[in-house]
Amino acid sequence: MFAVFLQGALLGAAMILPLGPQNAFVMNQGIRRQYHLMVALLCALSDMVLITAGIFGGSALLSQSSLLLGAVTWGGVAFLLWFGWGAMKTAFSKNIVLASAEVMKQSRWRIIATMLAVTWLNPHVYLDTFVVLGSLGSQFAGDARSWFALGTMTASFTWFFALALLASWLAPWLNTPRVQRVINFFVGVVMWGIALQLARHGWQ
């Protein structure tokens, strides 16, 4: 069973590591040290729910409904364009103001809402968990499927907490106006690139 667990962990890591809306948001919260561990936990818990749904039967729902898949795809395109636009606005802003403790208190629920949107409106999450993991997980039966799912969940929890903690540790070097502009510009380019790829896929 350990081999199945390791297979799930490696596959989960391969899909989580590339930069996407989730990773960008967790990284930025870590740099700002704004509820970064809470954000990492909520991202990991969301992934756990999606992984469970995808591996234990949810993949059939998405793959069999072209209407639902289209809604997820184009909703994701719109969200990625909006997310990228926000990053670009920050990148080219003349004044990047670091959040104070009072601002962080006021923005807790907004941070949670943004994190949930970044996760649940991200089409790659459904494609990865429902289509890729769902199809691979269906090859296992009984306990083996549970071990495969546990491996992918372990990779998710490990990565999000590691990213949040590393970004927080590097915050003194990363949390400067110049570096923030570079990071946000890069995030904006990547988000728009993903949106373009999804749009091309949606038109096919």
From Swiss-Prot:
Keyword flag Transmembrane: yes
GO molecular function: L-arginine transmembrane transporter activity
Tagged with keyword Cell inner membrane: yes
Transmembrane annotation, as ranges: 1-21, 37-57, 67-87, 111-131, 147-167, 179-199
InterPro entries referenced in this protein's UniProt entry, alphabetically: Arg_export_ArgO_enterobac, LeuE-type, Lys/arg_exporter
GO cellular-component term (any): plasma membrane
Keywords: Amino-acid transport, Cell inner membrane, Cell membrane, Membrane, Transmembrane, Transmembrane helix, Transport
Known catalytic reactions: L-arginine(in) = L-arginine(out)
Any Pfam family hit: LysE
Membrane topology of the entry: Multi-pass membrane protein
Subcellular localization: Cell inner membrane
Family: Belongs to the LysE/ArgO transporter (TC 2.A.75) family.
PANTHER family: ARGININE EXPORTER PROTEIN ARGO, ARGININE EXPORTER PROTEIN ARGO-RELATED
Record's function text: Involved in the export of arginine. Important to control the intracellular level of arginine and the correct balance between arginine and lysine.
Protein's UniProt name: Arginine exporter protein ArgO
Protein source organism: Pectobacterium carotovorum subsp. carotovorum (strain PC1)
Chain's gene name: argO
